[in-house]
Amino acid sequence: MRASVVLTCYCWLLVRVSSIHPECRFHLEIQEEETKCAELLSSQTENQRACSGVWDNITCWRPADVGETVTVPCPKVFSNFYSRPGNISKNCTSDGWSETFPDFIDACGYNDPEDESKISFYILVKAIYTLGYSVSLMSLTTGSIIICLFRKLHCTRNYIHLNLFLSFMLRAISVLVKDSVLYSSSGLLRCHDQPASWVGCKLSLVFFQYCIMANFYWLLVEGLYLHTLLVAILPPSRCFLAYLLIGWGIPSVCIGAWTATRLSLEDTGCWDTNDHSIPWWVIRMPILISIVVNFALFISIVRILLQKLTSPDVGGNDQSQYKRLAKSTLLLIPLFGVHYMVFAAFPIGISSTYQILFELCVGSFQGLVVAVLYCFLNSEVQCELKRRWRGLCLTQAGSRDYRLHSWSMSRNGSESALQIHRGSRTQSFLQSETSVI
């Protein structure tokens, strides 16, 4: 019963990224802790103590003398399910180790009534972000097709939008594929075969991390493009290659460095744990830099727009242009920058519940917001769609009129031919009657 509760909780733990079955990962972590315990006990000299060091399948106990009480924290492998910090103990007696006390479930808080609500919360969050990524993927795909179909929409601005769309689509696909593998219940578990599939598991995680980082950097490219457009340092079209290098190149370099540090420093499991700080910061620092730079660009863009909109030198046409620019972009940059900045600057003081809601629920609908702002509400896109719709309507109307005209001409021709035929028969009859007379 105790193991089933823990495994159920583990299956719905959403903050981890994995590509193997959760139960297999659970057993793997138990094996890793057992190996560490064996190494620790082998390095210690027992000095003929009454109670030798032992691994009791969940916790490592050091050697002790009779009458000594050994106290250890709750097992590390269950740390994701602690409702409160706790300790468990054992006494060393003349007959050996005593039973663990206090009760394992009571000491570590696994029977906390909040556990059921937490599991329900994780299930709800998973359902919400699955819906969000699915809707975002469909809307982004539709928006990309629209931009690609109309040649008048082919420009540097929309090329950048397409790359941003692609980064969001890849992010959604990587999350949905990861979840389909992680929460798949088809087939029998063969955990002893899982280590042979670590390569595919690690590759899936590398792809996932790359999509996340590329998405952040294409949001940064959008901010850079808008800032360049406002300050007019260089023509935006001349910077497109640099934008490509920033959006796809920098994440490639960073993920390559992260892979190298993982292989050399923490090549364990599916690379979804962060026990070593160096690989964690190798992948986290570039994302933090993009968030901070994008937030600084947002502040600068707001300042420039306010100056231009309040300037008396700005004419009516220019002012309306800046207003359109502000409507289509200023709603986007705060949405992608401000809440990320909050969690980047204050990661400790904010509840993990709110962070999960923002990162998973709100973040999953970002692709939908991007598609709406940069495609469906874009005046150029709407004009092209209306023009194409009018063209289709006119084509159908013309085809219908042509069919009606052809049918009318055919009918008139048939009636004329019938009248001529009748007249010729009458004339022939009269001629025959006359000849008889």
Swiss-Prot record:
Disulfide bonds join 37-60, 51-92, 74-108, 201-270. It is found in: Cell membrane. InterPro entries: GPCR_2, GPCR_2-like_7TM, GPCR_2_extracell_dom_sf, GPCR_2_extracellular_dom, GPCR_2_secretin-like, GPCR_2_secretin-like_CS, GPCR_2_VIP_rcpt, GPCR_2_VIP_rcpt_2. Gene3D superfamilies: GPCR, family 2, extracellular hormone receptor domain (4.10.1240.10), Rhodopsin 7-helix transmembrane proteins (1.20.1070.10). GO terms for cellular component: plasma membrane. Residues 150-157, 228-238, 304-324, 378-437 are cytoplasmic. It is a multi-pass membrane protein. One of its GO terms (biological process) is cell surface receptor signaling pathway. SMART domains: HormR. Glycans are attached at residues 57, 87, 91. PANTHER family: PDF RECEPTOR-LIKE PROTEIN-RELATED, VASOACTIVE INTESTINAL POLYPEPTIDE RECEPTOR 2. This is Vasoactive intestinal polypeptide receptor 2.
